[in-house]
């Protein structure tokens, strides 16, 4: 069947794109259109790379939508062909082909109509919610001013002693009391809100899910924020009001970045935040009837959560915008972003969230028929290694062993036989790790090496655990969520044993409640004081790594410099073994960066079945590799490289390490920069070999 092609990009936000920008947009467009394509595209920093990638990819999404409206059969519709004929059939009668085209066009029209109505509804409701929030904020301000004014008057008329302030009932004023009641009603968190409202109870309509989804990943959230800024400058990001090309975008991040609940966010470590969030989302009650308080930004806030999701889809938001809006509307940005993900045309997320299979699955990211783009891809191989690395210290495994023993002793009469069996295996494995690491410390007296390398199988044999089925244990830990239970109970026990604290603890004992100035504030304990939650997750990560093939990685057992502690660390050797899951599931994978050279080495690490050294286009049985590298947008006529051997006063410019601290040399460099600035109308940029030398020169100047 014919493929979509595009040579011009009128949606590019600037009048005349550079030739290399047009070429990059074409390459991205073509890689997205050709299913099972691996694109490796190199474009120098400062050439508008991110904008070109966005326009190329989103133009493809828009063209696919328009092709469906024309009734064209696309490559991703073969399996859903209702007529039951093969795409290769050329003997179909004209009336059957005409009917098939008309049916697809009708179906596409209906889907587009529903999707368009849904998008219009989202934008209208987001606008209405924004208006309501503004009115509410203004009303809050006026009511507070009225209450404060009344309170000030009372203080001026009736000065109280400290004793009276403690025991005397507040003076009653009907006006101020009415204002207080209005304020309470206005600020109430809709606790009587019906969780089964029609607005939120409707199931996800698969027909409204985008046919194609672009997943753009970068290393940091700040880089993704820059992508949002570029998107807003295009018609796809809402630069033109009510444009049919506008897409829905969703920025995905972890709880640590999006949590707006101070009692949870103040916990510090990501592991504690995750555990606490899961506890509060369940809103259970203990046997002593001490409720684990539900999160006020999630529980009975379903309408606000829906409105936040709709606002996120209505116009592009980075995670800072989403978190700020969530705090204002008292709705959880993390769960709003997750619920927005299925309906988004463009998904923005950091490397780690997509590369790690379990994280990707927990977020609900579906790679099928999606085009995955990795920006700044020179970091990609390291990101794969980091995502699947694991490390645990002797102190951590001791802590986990203590928690496991306490947990089993407490609940052994209520645990099923299967749970007890797996927990016994986990306990024996943890105890074996403790033994090996203690032995490693004892080797200090024998002058043994501080670090040694071993294979996965040899390490398990050394621990006496080579008969343990790591796959079965890993599956148990993943499906039972027992690690979360053990960590939570361990935190509860730790809180109960903390005799040094005389105040209150919150529901699960993770946060101290301290009275400050008449108010109770949540005070997070030192995350390094007893990091039990992180210890459990560190051990589960190591077990997950030990289920790898023996050739995929190695185990490093090492002591610290003091010889009082030891650790075991898994390092991944074969990035392709993990990255191939993304390649196999996604429609196409595109790597983009300013400097990807040497490209053959990058390809060999991520796509070893392809040989990139021979051609710019490599075909294999399953995938096609497309490579492209362009020059800079600066014309050659605008470049004049000059080597300056001496300065204006004849001082030789010797910037070797031993001579560059010479004061006379630094002064001569200053004269050169001063002269260059006088004749350069746009200013001058000066690059130094190190930050320290730049600071030294700047201080002298």
Predicted features, each with a name:
Residues 320-344, 355-364, 473, 477-649, ...:
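A contiguous, basic/glycine-rich beta-loop/short-helix subdomain that forms a polymer-engagement track
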Residues 2-11, 15, 19, 61-347, ...:
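A substrate-engagement module of RecA-like helicase motors
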Residues 366-399:
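SF2 helicase catalytic motif II
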């Amino acid at each position: 069947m014919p493929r979509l092609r595009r040579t011009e990009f009128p949606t590019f936000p600037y009048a005349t794109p550079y030739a290399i920008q047009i070429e990059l947009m074409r390459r991205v467009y073509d890689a997205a259109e050709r299913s099972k394509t691996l694109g490796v595209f190199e474009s120098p920093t400062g050439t508008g790379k991110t904008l070109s990638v966005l326009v190329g990819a989103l133009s493809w999404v828009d063209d696919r939508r328009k092709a469906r409206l024309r009734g064209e059969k696309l490559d991703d519709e073969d399996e859903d062909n209702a007529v039951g004929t093969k795409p290769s059939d050329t003997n179909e009668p004209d009336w059957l082909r005409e009917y098939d085209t008309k049916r697809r066009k009708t179906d596409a029209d209906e889907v587009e109509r529903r999707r368009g109505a849904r998008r219009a509804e989202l934008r209208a409701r987001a606008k209405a919610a924004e208006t309501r929030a503004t009115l509410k904020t203004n009303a809050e301000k006026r009511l507070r001013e009225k209450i404060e004014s009344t309170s000030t008057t009372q203080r001026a008329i009736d000065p109280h002693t400290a004793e009276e302030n403690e025991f005397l009932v507040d003076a009653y004023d009907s006006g101020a009391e009415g204002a207080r009641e209005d304020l309470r009603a206005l600020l109430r968190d809709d606790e009587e809100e019906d969780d089964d409202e029609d607005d939120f109870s409707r199931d996800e309509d698969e027909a409204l899910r985008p046919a194609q989804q672009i997943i753009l990943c970068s290393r940091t959230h700040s880089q993704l924020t820059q992508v949002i800024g570029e998107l807003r400058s295009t018609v796809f990001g809402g630069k033109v009001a009510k444009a049919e090309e506008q897409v829905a975008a969703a920025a995905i991040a972890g709880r640590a970045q999006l949590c707006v609940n101070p009692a949870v966010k103040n916990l510090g470590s990501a592991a504690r935040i995750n555990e606490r969030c899961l506890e509060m989302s369940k809103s259970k009650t203990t046997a002593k009837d001490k409720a684990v308080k539900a999160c006020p930004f999630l529980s009975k806030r379903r309408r606000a959560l829906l409105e936040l999701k709709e606002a996120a889809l209505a116009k592009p938001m980075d995670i800072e915008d989403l978190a700020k809006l969530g705090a204002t509307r008292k709705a959880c940005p993390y769960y709003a972003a997750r619920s927005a993900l299925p309906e988004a045309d463009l998904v923005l997320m950091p490397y780690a969230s997509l590369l790690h299979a379990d994280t990707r699955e927990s977020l609900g990211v579906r790679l099928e028929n999606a085009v995955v783009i990795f920006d700044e891809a020179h970091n990609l191989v390291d990101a794969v290694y980091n995502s699947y690395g694991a490390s645990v210290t002797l102190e951590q495994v001791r802590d986990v062993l203590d928690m496991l023993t306490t947990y089993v002793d407490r609940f052994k009469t209520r645990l099923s036989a299967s749970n007890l069996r797996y927990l016994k295996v986990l306990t024996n494995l943890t105890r074996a790790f403790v033994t090996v690491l203690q032995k490693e410390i004892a080797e200090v007296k024998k002058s043994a090496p501080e670090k040694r390398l071993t294979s996965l199988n040899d390490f398990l044999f050394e621990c006496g655990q080579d008969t343990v089925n790591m796959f079965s244990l890993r599956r148990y830990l993943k499906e039972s969520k027992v690690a979360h239970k053990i960590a939570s109970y361990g935190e509860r026990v730790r809180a109960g044993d903390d005799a040094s604290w005389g105040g209150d603890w919150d529901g699960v004992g993770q946060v101290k409640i301290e009275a400050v100035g008449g108010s109770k504030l949540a005070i997070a304990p030192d995350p390094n004081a007893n990091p039990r939650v992180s210890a459990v997750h560190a051990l589960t990560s190591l077990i997950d790594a030990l289920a790898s093939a023996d050739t995929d990685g190695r185990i490093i057992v090492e002591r610290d410099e003091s010889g009082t502690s030891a650790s075991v660390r898994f390092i991944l050797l074969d990035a392709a073994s993990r990255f191939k899951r993304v390649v196999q599931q996604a429609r196409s994978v595109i790597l983009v960066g300013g400097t990807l050279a040497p490209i053959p080495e990058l390809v060999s690490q991520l796509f070893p079945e392809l040989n990139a050294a021979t051609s710019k286009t490599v075909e294999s049985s399953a995938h096609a590799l497309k490579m492209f590298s362009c020059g800079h947008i600066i014309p050659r006529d605008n470049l004049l490289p000059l080597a300056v051997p001496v300065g204006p006063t004849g001082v030789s410019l010797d910037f070797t390490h031993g001579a560059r601290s010479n004061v006379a040399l630094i002064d001569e460099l200053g004269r050169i920069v001063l002269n260059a600035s006088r004749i350069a109308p746009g200013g001058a940029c000066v690059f130094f070999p190190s930050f320290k030398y730049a600071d030294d020169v700047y201080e002298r100047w």
